[in-house]
Amino acid sequence: MGSGDTRGESSLVAKPIEIILNKLPHAILAQQQFQKYITSPIYRYLSKLLLFREVAWPESTKDTQKGQVGIFSFQNNYADSATTFRILAHLDEQRYPLPNGAAEKNLPSLFEGFKATVSIIQQRLLLDNVDGATNSDKEKYVQLPDINTGFVNKTYSRIDLTHLLEDVETNVENLSINKTLEMDELTRLDSMINELESRKLKILERVKHIDSKSTNLENDVTLIKDRINFIEEYNLEADREQSLRKQMEEERSSEASSFTQNEEAISSLCDVESKDTRLKDFYKMPHEKSHDKNRQIISETYSRNTTAFRMTIPHGEHGNSITALDFDTPWGTLCSSSYQDRIVKVWDLNHGIQVGELPGHLATVNCMQIDKKNYNMLITGSKDATLKLWDLNLSREIYLDHSPLKEKTEEIVTPCIHNFELHKDEITALSFDSEALVSGSRDKKIFHWDLTTGKCIQQLDLIFTPTHSDIKMPARSLNNGACLLGTEAPMIGALQCYNSALATGTKDGIVRLWDLRVGKPVRLLEGHTDGITSLKFDSEKLVTGSMDNSVRIWDLRTSSILDVIAYDLPVSSLDFDGKLITVGANEGGVNVFNMERDEHWMTPEPPHSLDGDELSRRIAIVKYKDGFLINGHNDGDINVWTL
């Protein structure tokens, strides 16, 4: 095959390509080298053909380089002219106009930014070489050309001024571009700062949530430690608790059959039903309170409005302070407890002898109340965080009969009818009336109970301000009845309920009057400057005693103070029957105030059963009902008076 054949073959190959390519403008050919993002397959194919034509047959592009354009530029054997035009005029997304949002920013182009930056770099290099030191950042963009104003004012050369004007305008334009770049950088930094602020707020919220959880856990730790100290202090780690714990662990680890589990569940339900049944049966039983015919003869021996000492009842041999007592005078039953004595003793008030005892509490009994209406029962509250309802008739029978076992079932008989167990700390005050029981505890909670079912009706939460909750107030020492500074007063020092009305006295010195129907305080009586230890109210008046060495008499109708009685020592206990107020103010005798006659006097110092210092004897608790006054001393003696 000769050279002529080769040229002919080449012309045969190039001829159809020239139909498409020979007529294309040179500008379009130059653009094809940069089309990296073209999506049309035909467009990519045409670009490759253009590049191949320039390399293989450079002479074929001569006509194009001469600028021969026209209608023949779009003629070919593969597509019509309109289709070829659309293909060759295609613009990809990179060549689209900027959106309105970007256009509104009016940012400098890449080339403009490059020009402005290059001029700055050149000036910086020149200054660094000349001065040998770097200027401050504020001079970075203000390196202007040195313009001699005298030359400008004196020259008449239009060419020189034109060149100088161009230089100045160039610098102005560069400064404008630099300002735009800096503002854009500032906007970006503001956006970053806002994002960091948002992240900071989120982190602070997480930290706050973590602090809340940490506080709750710290409260749990404090509660657990207090409970451990409480158990260690009173040595309450009994064998019964150990056996129960061991039994619970065995039940968790064992794989008992479903039949056994059902049987245990049924037995537990039966136990609950038996407890509820016993409580219901207790109210159905006839309750004949112990009545002594000699009581009327004895009471008539002493005339009213005169103070007469009747007897002293020694509570125990250890001389511990009386912590709680109550009595029902018409039937002559007295119940009392002393410090670190877990057993409540029942006395015949007319003969001064013990007729029963109530074992069951695991720690000191702090408060108690005898039902004065229908049932011969007693409710006690203890440091073991439980309340117990006792059958006093049954306690007499067990104590006098000395037969703790039933004949048929051999079941242990206990005078405790029901346990109220919801508080998490020691019980400090209780009061019941009709079918409702209210209890206050060191855990800052007040529970309202239904006596017929033994279930809690509602919970009342006390809220103290930080200044009140953290203050250290004086409190009565249980082992000597004296007031010791530096100890913390009871959170709930006293309370009394009557129907739906409830009055509470707390360590912040505030008396709160509650409506049990809504479970909220309706009035606050503020006046005491220290913790309240006792209170009593009737239909018109409320009397309160406090650690601030005072007794205050309030008018419930106007919430105003009617009278204030000051003492030398803190008030540990008081009682009120509408006419007489009896006050134990850590003195040897009981202070009596007759409101009708406005008279004050003190009971004389009675003889006591234990040897000791007369000056160290203090009144720890007082109770007054129907002309009978009973007070408990810090040495364990109980005195009975008629007023």
Swiss-Prot record:
Pfam name, any one: Caf4
Residue ranges of coiled coil: 160-255
SMART domains linked: WD40
Keyword Isomerase belongs to the record: no
Skewed-composition ranges (Basic and acidic residues): 243-254
Repeat positions for WD: 317-357, 360-400, 422-461, 479-526, 527-566, 568-603, 614-643
GO biological-process terms attached to the record: mitochondrial fission; peroxisome fission; regulation of transcription by RNA polymerase II
Function: Involved in mitochondrial fission. Has a partially redundant function to MDV1 in acting as an adapter protein, binding to FIS1 on the mitochondrial outer membrane and recruiting the dynamin-like GTPase DNM1 to form mitochondrial fission complexes. Plays a key role in determining the polarized localization of those DNM1 clusters that are not immediately involved in the mitochondrial fission process.
Protein family (similarity comment): Belongs to the WD repeat MDV1/CAF4 family.
Quaternary data: Interacts with DNM1, FIS1 and MDV1, components of the mitochondrial fission machinery. Interacts via its WD repeats with DNM1. Interacts with CCR4 and NOT1, components of the CCR4-NOT complex. It is however not a component of the 1.0 MDa CCR4-NOT core complex, but appears to be part of a less characterized, 1.9 MDa CCR4-NOT complex. Interacts with DBF2, another likely component of the 1.9 MDa complex. Interacts with SRB9 and SRB10, components of the SRB8-11 complex.
Protein known as: CCR4-associated factor 4
Source species of the chain: Saccharomyces cerevisiae (strain ATCC 204508 / S288c) (Baker's yeast)
Taxonomic lineage from the root: Eukaryota, Fungi, Dikarya, Ascomycota, Saccharomycotina
